[in-house]
Amino acid sequence: MPRQAGQSGWAKPLRVDGSNARCQWSRTTKSPLIVRDLDLLTELDRRNAVEVHITITSVDPRLARRLEVQAPDPQARLRTVSRLAEAGISTRVNCMPVMPGINDGEEALVPLFERAKAAGATDVHAAALFLRPATRAVFFPWLEEEFPGLVGLYRRLFAHRDYLGEAAKDALLKTYRRLRLEPGLPRPLAGRA
């Protein structure tokens, strides 16, 4: 009988008997609980290309708490990156969403890149905020409460669309793109091309 993961619901369907060999497999999470299945991830990685993406919008604990009220602390997520990287699992940090005037500047991104590299992340990816109607209904009241000085900017940026226009998106991600080109990222994982 093939071994199945025991504790985590997401891992139950994963087979590690070789029948799914040579697959690319990834998991995106904010939760440090993924390390409960480190043995399964390591075993899967022997025959597959396993990558875990840990979402961290900010390494500043106060800002992170404002952005993600119920998410695990960013320091706990960075420790998760370290544990996965130490086990040889390719681990990427996702800075998502990047939000104008909130977490898009050097004061937010430089520490995130430094901490992600120090933790052993193979890369840092980012994506701009987008606001579909259901999200917009929750987002703007939150923005008025947390960042009232930015409400006008966001209303202009998202007045007639769910996604930022190309010029606004390019401006938003400019610092991220520059930092990602600095030495150290993306880094290859030993044993992989």
Language-model regions, residue ranges each:
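Conserved AdoMet/S-adenosylmethionine-binding subsite of the radical SAM
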Residues: 1-157, 161-164
